[in-house]
A protein has these predicted regions:
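Glycine/small-residue-rich loop that forms an oxyanion/phosphate-binding "nest" at active or ligand-binding sites
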Residues: 75-88
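Boundary-proximal intrinsically disordered activation/regulatory segments immediately upstream
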Residues: 1-57
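Short, charged/polar "capping" segments at the starts of alpha-helices
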Residues: 58-64, 154-155
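A contiguous loop/helix-start segment that scaffolds small-molecule binding in enzyme catalytic cores
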Residues: 206-215
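Conserved small/polar residues in nucleotide/adenosyl-binding loops
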Residues: 219-220
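RNA substrate-binding interface of SAM-dependent RNA methyltransferases
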Residues: 38, 45, 105-203
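Short acidic-hydrophobic, aromatic-tinged amphipathic segments that line or gate anion-handling sites
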Residues: 6-7, 74-76, 171-178
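Glycine-rich phosphate-binding loops that contact phosphosugars or nucleotide phosphates
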Residues: 95
């Protein structure tokens, strides 16, 4: 049976990951939060560990078919959820996932892997920009996202929302030193590094013959 828990109090400690979502730092946190029926459904169907789901009492009947028996489901009224998260919330459903173990750059070129089709973002500081890049990368069939040490968090609420949950299936690699790591990537046998620039003199994308292993380098804000 579905593990639906009608809570007596919005102060229940199990709701900790959902509290004050706007007022706290998400970077490197143990858990991440997703908003809305669509993204919660994608999270539940992914290979990531789902800690819990928080549902408005007006939405529980609608989303019940999405919810597996193995995941605790907390049900509260809208005003109680808004008090917990710290802002007006109309989507009615939130999910809490466990952040996957961060992949090191050295794992990127390991043995037994598929051909590398990656995008590298040395210093993307805007969550919506990174989310757009991730969504596009997933649509194009890329299989790796390389982030510089100063890049924003791929598991922030805003990034996940804009990416439409691309982080659930796109492996994310965090560099310790992006310049030296990308130099190592360039030096790896057969790897092609392509830099994307807004320049009318640049070689058009249609003129590039990609290698089996390649990485597109993006600089933006």
């Amino acid at each position: 049976p579905l593990a639906v828990l009608d809570l007596d109090s919005a102060g229940d400690e199990r709701l900790g990951p959902y509290r004050d979502l706007k007022g706290r730092s998400e970077f490197g946190a143990e858990h991440f939060i997703v908003e809305g029926e669509h993204l919660v459904g994608r999270l539940l169907s992914s290979a990531l560990e789902v800690v819990s789901v928080l549902v408005s009492s007006r939405k529980i009947d609608r989303v019940r078919p999405l919810l597996p028996a193995s995941v605790p489901v907390f049900v509260l009224d809208d005003d109680e959820i808004e008090n917990i998260v710290g802002f007006k919330f109309h989507r009615g459903v939130l999910g809490c996932g466990k952040r996957p173990e961060e992949l090191g750059f050295d794992q990127l070129l390991g043995s037994g892997r598929p051909a590398l089709k990656a995008v590298a973002c040395p210093e993307i500081t805007d969550s919506e920009n990174l989310g757009s890049i991730m969504r596009t990368a997933r649509c194009l069939g890329l299989n790796a996202l390389i982030l510089g040490e100063r890049c924003t968090d791929a598991y922030s609420r805003r990034c996940i929302r804009v990416s439409m949950g691309a982080a659930f299936t796109l492996p994310v690699y965090r560099c310790g030193a992006v310049v030296s790591d990308l130099k190592k990537l360039c030096a790896a046998p057969g790897v092609q590094l392509v830099g994307a620039v807004a320049d009318p003199e640049a070689l058009p994308l249609s003129g590039i013959v990609p290698a089996d292993d390649w990485c597109c380098l993006l600089y933006t804000s």
